[in-house]
A protein has these predicted regions:
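P-loop NTPase motor module signature
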Residues: 1-423, 538, 722-724
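C-terminal accessory/binding modules appended to enzymatic or scaffolding proteins
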Residues: 686-748
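Extended active-site and interfacial segments that coordinate phosphate-rich ligands
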Residues: 111-126, 290-294, 303, 315, ...
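Structural motif
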Residues: 129, 349-356, 381-384, 413-418, ...
Length: 809
């Protein structure tokens, strides 16, 4: 029996696999779950068929396969094999295949029954990659509908057992306790007055001086690795090798980082979280953890992915610390305070909650699932991200309604990112296929640093690109073609139409067809070109413009000739602010980018009217001719809604009238072809015609334009938005009126502005009866002296009214 910790639970695990379709294994770092346990399951002989072991990363997959083969005294390709993108090492006698995530998904899509497979092992499941979540969902679906004999083992160092057990309540949980060796965990926050790279390098160099052994240094990204490496090179002894390790490094370079240091040497491996997984890096007993990681977050509004740097979870800290105790007792220095570590999230967010889901949706539709909620997820894909994915697949012509189109089915069989799959399947000649395959290979593994010129990269003969291109051509069943740089733009444009860009203002600043901004570095030679297509973009954490990582100069006229289907043409009429006229244009656009504008001699009346309405909305209702009569009608409607709310009065505030121009103004615009004619539109008539007949009758009866006073004179009522309605009338014409007149079904009294014979205000009142009995006496006394020839009776409420201003006129 092995001394590895996982050996202690082997009998329990083997028994669980016999009894249950799904088993959960929680085994800490260094327990031997990846590099020992699969062989024991194979040797047990109770699994009916081959074993597939899923590893999330290519380097880990190859290393695990090599280690397992070594333990059998063999080479990969015999009993143990591996398959990954662009590389396969399996043979007719292979019984255990180590595969990467995309390979497992492709296998399931090609053969949903997994013929000849008895067990699938999902390793490092705590990482919760998008593909691992998808693999789990598909495997559970296979078990439920096609293969009730298929076994599934989910294992990790930091399993979220509670959630997995809710999803799989019948699954046994097997726990392997303890690491191989103890790890002393220390906490020390970085000095605030030092730059990050300098502070990390100082902390790492100090630990190297104090302790023996090689070091694994976790950093958030490639930029930090390069800067810390530069700082460390000045601080470490000559017997210390500095080895970077990150996913974009060629596999040969990654392998150098995990090999033992030469005799008499130590090494520092500067790594991203790639080293959290099942890689065993020889000689490591020191770990320095920056406690940071860089994660990709998809923005469904823009369709771009944003990279952010954030604190890692407590589970990741535990995983990183475990790297120090795989081969001997070790030390882990976390570069933050212990209190900060305790406040960190328990687990990292799964990728499925923050990723572009277009590839996942394409896989689900190929699987035959139109509604993701029908499947058994640990975390249901977010609806907003699925909606963005559906929009992209529609733009790529991959959908017909809710199903895959014929083009979409071809895309799905390739297993590429949907945009690249669309480009590959659109190639209709051998040369186009060769060109598209090389472009896809470059975009899958883009060059790091240096030029952003995609054309320059395309001209290079790089081994990994050529190998991947040949693999893609084999899938396309295409042969004999030659890559043609002249066809690059025509092939890229349909798949990346929203990323066609036009220069704006400053050199290096561009607007994308989707309306977003994008930028090149100030000294980038591509900035000289007016038009680009930028298939590789990255949204920064703070800058509003996306950064162009890889782009190709465009001859826009040539592209229009090659891909006329990308062009949208529209006739528009616009309000010319400078000249106060309407101008008609025919525009040719790609998305929001205008390629060509031509004047139109005679637009239709509908186009003219729409332009006028757009102009009114842009400039406000003040551009119309609001006569006093129109203003009063609008105020009457406003007041009616306040005083008689039980009726369905139309809203007449600015926002509502602007929103409903088509309903009330447009019918009045027949024959209106100019701004001068628009100014002549009768707005009072427009608003009146807008009202249903019953409301018009109610308005005229309950909120009349005029009030008939006792003399028979019709006096205009003034309506206000914030004040009561008012009636200005000579006092003599109100004689005989005992009480204040009311409108709106008697709910609203009129404010009476009682005027002198000279039409000057004498009194303002809302209670005529009280005025006649009270304040009128003072007015009468004063007016008799000033206007002795006029009538000033003692009992005005019962005196006949008069239009005459003098007693005997």
């Amino acid at each position: 029996m092995s001394s590895l910790p996982v050996a202690a639970i082997l009998p329990e695990l083997l028994s669980a696999l016999q009894q249950a379709p799904q088993v959960l294994l929680n085994a800490p770092t260094g327990a031997g779950k990846s590099t020992w346990l699969p062989l024991q399951i194979l040797a047990d002989g109770n699994i009916d068929g081959r074993i597939i072991l899923l590893e999330p990363r290519r380097l880990a997959a190859r290393n695990v396969a090599q280690r397992l083969a070594e333990l059998l005294g063999e080479k990969p390709g015999e009993t143990i094999g591996y398959r990954m993108r662009a590389e396969s090492c399996v043979g007719p006698n292979t019984r255990l295949e180590v595969v990467t995530e995309g390979i497992l998904t492709r296998t399931l899509q090609h053969d949903p029954e997994l013929s000849g497979v008895g067990l699938v092992i999902l390793d490092e499941f705590h990482e919760r990659s998008l593909q691992a979540d998808l693999a789990l969902v598909l495997l559970l679906d296979v078990q439920q509908g096609l293969r009730d004999d298929l076994k599934l083992l989910i294992m990790s160092a930091t399993l979220d057992n509670d959630r997995l057990q809710r999803l799989l309540p019948e699954a046994p949980v097997v726990v392997s306790e303890g690491r191989a060796f103890p790890v002393e965990r220390r906490f020390a926050p970085l000095a605030s007055h030092q730059r990050f790279a300098e502070a990390v390098a100082i902390a790492a160099a100090d630990l190297l001086r104090e302790e023996q052994g090689s070091m694994l240094l976790f950093l958030p990204g490639v930029g930090e690795i390069q800067r810390v490496q530069e700082q460390l090179s000045e601080r470490v002894a000559s017997d210390v090798l500095l080895c970077p390790l990150y996913g974009a490094l060629p596999l040969s370079e990654q392998r150098k980082a995990i090999l033992p240091a030469p005799a008499g040497m130590r090494k520092v491996v500067l790594a991203t979280n790639i080293a959290e997984t099942s890689l065993t890096i020889e000689g490591i007993r020191l770990v320095v953890d920056s406690a940071q990681e860089r994660v990709a977050r998809f923005d469904p509004r823009t369709g771009l992915t944003r990279l952010i740097t954030q604190r890692i979870s407590q589970a990741s800290m535990t995983q990183r610390a475990g790297r120090a105790g795989r081969l001997e007792p070790g030390i882990c220095l976390h570069l933050l305070a212990k209190e900060q570590a305790e406040r960190a999230a328990a687990q990292s967010d799964p990728e499925i909650l923050q990723s572009d889901l277009s590839g996942l949706l394409l896989e689900l539709l190929q699987w035959g699932c139109r509604d993701p909620a029908e499947l058994r997820w640990l975390d249901l894909p977010p609806a907003i991200n699925l909606a963005a994915a559906r929009r992209l697949l529609t733009a790529l012509s991959a959908l017909e309604g809710e199903r895959l189109s014929a083009h979409g089915r071809k895309m799905a069989t390739l297993g590429n990112d949907p945009r690249l799959a669309a480009m590959l399947t659109a190639a209709d000649s051998a040369d186009d296929a060769a060109t598209a395959a090389k472009l896809a290979a470059i975009l899958e593994e883009p060059p790091r640093g240096g030029s952003s010129d995609l054309g320059a990269a395309f001209a290079r003969q790089q081994g990994n690109w050529q190998q991947r291109a040949q693999q893609l051509l084999k899938r396309l069943a295409s042969r004999g073609g030659q890559p043609d740089a002249a066809r690059m733009a025509a092939l890229l444009a349909p798949a990346f139409a929203d990323r066609i860009a036009r220069r704006r203002g400053q050199e290096g600043r561009y607007q994308l067809a989707n309306g977003m901004g994008a930028m090149l570095d100030a000294d980038d030679a591509l900035g000289r070109h007016e038009w680009l297509i930028a298939p590789l973009l990255l949204q920064g954490s703070s800058a509003p413009d996306a950064r162009i990582l890889l782009a190709l100069p465009l001859d826009i006229d040539q592209l229009v000739a090659q891909r006329p289907e990308l062009i949208q043409r529209s006739d528009t009429v616009e309000w010319d602010e400078a000249q106060g006229t309407l101008k008609a244009w025919r525009r040719s656009c790609i998305g929001q980018l205008v390629i060509k504008t031509q004047p139109l001699a005679k637009p239709s009346e509908a186009e003219l009217h729409q332009a006028m309405l757009n102009g009114i909305r842009d400039k406000g209702l003040g551009v119309l001719n609001w006569t006093p009569e129109a203003e009063q009608l609008r105020l009457r409607l406003y007041c009616a809604a306040q005083w008689l709310p039980e009726a369905d009065w139309p809203a007449v505030d600015d926002a509502s009238l602007l929103a409903s121009l088509e309903a009330w103004l447009l019918p009045q615009m027949t024959g209106v072809h100019s701004l001068r004619a628009l100014k002549a539109v009768d707005l009072r008539q427009a608003l009146q015609n807008w009202l249903p007949w019953t409301l018009r009758q109610k308005l005229d009866s309950e909120l009349p334009t005029h009030y008939t006073v006792p003399t028979g004179s019709r006096i205009a009522i003034r309506y206000h938005e914030d004040n009561p309605p008012a009636l200005a009338v000579r006092m003599q014409e109100m004689f005989g009126e005992a009480t204040t007149p009311r409108i709106a079904e008697g709910r609203v009294p009129l404010v009476l502005e009682l005027l002198s014979p000279a039409q000057r205000p004498l009194q303002i009142t809302r209670d005529l009866s009280a005025f006649w009995q009270g304040a009128y006496r003072e007015v009468q006394k004063e007016m008799k002296g000033r206007y002795p020839k006029h009538v000033w009776p003692d009992d005005p409420a019962n005196t006949a009214p008069t239009r005459r201003t003098k007693k005997y006129s």
